[in-house]
């Protein structure tokens, strides 16, 4: 299940308290974000050892700025509290490869 983050404090807490976190930085008005959302949700059900969250770039702008997000969707992988990988764009196969790289 994908959790929607609503504050900087919540984002920081999730990132620091979980070994592997995949973050989808999205916007409600973003067509590609909407297109890949069901696939991201499916991945959260398949790869249950990872935490999947979403951050609305317009609603939680402090996280967006801190993480230097400039395009949507942007997917970031956090391992033990640190950003370790980034994927730009709504590419299902590239997102699956990114997730599988860290799921192993």
UniProtKB/Swiss-Prot annotation:
It comes from the Eukaryota. The active site is at residues 30, 33. GO terms for molecular function: protein-disulfide reductase activity. CDD domains: TRX_family (cd02947). Changing residue 30 to S: Does not stably interact with OAT and fails to increase OAT catalytic activity. Does not stably interact with SAHH. Pfam families: Thioredoxin (PF00085). Keywords: Cytoplasm, Disulfide bond, Electron transport, Redox-active center, Transport. The keyword Transport applies. The keyword Ion transport does not apply. The record marks 31-32 as: Contributes to redox potential value. Changing residue 43 to S: Does not stably interact with OAT and fails to increase OAT catalytic activity. The disulfide bond between Cys-30 and Cys-33 acts as a redox-active center and is reduced by thioredoxin reductase TRXR. Its main location: cytoplasm. The record marks 24 as: Deprotonates C-terminal active site Cys. Residues 2-104 form the Thioredoxin domain. It is found in: Cytoplasm. One of its GO terms (cellular component) is cytosol. Disulfide bonds join 30-33. Belongs to the thioredoxin family. This is Thioredoxin 1. The lineage of its organism: Eukaryota, Sar, Alveolata, Apicomplexa, Aconoidasida. The gene is TRX1.
């Amino acid at each position: 299940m994908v959790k929607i983050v609503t504050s900087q404090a919540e984002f920081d807490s999730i990132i620091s308290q979980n070994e592997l976190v995949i973050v989808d930085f999205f916007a409600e008005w973003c067509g590609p974000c909407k297109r890949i959302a069901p696939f991201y949700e499916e991945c959260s059900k398949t790869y249950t050892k990872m935490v999947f969250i979403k951050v609305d770039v317009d609603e939680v702008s402090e996280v967006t700025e801190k993480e230097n997000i400039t395009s949507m969707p942007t997917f970031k992988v956090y391992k033990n509290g640190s950003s370790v990988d980034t994927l730009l764009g709504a590419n299902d196969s590239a997102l699956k490869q990114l997730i599988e790289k860290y799921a192993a």
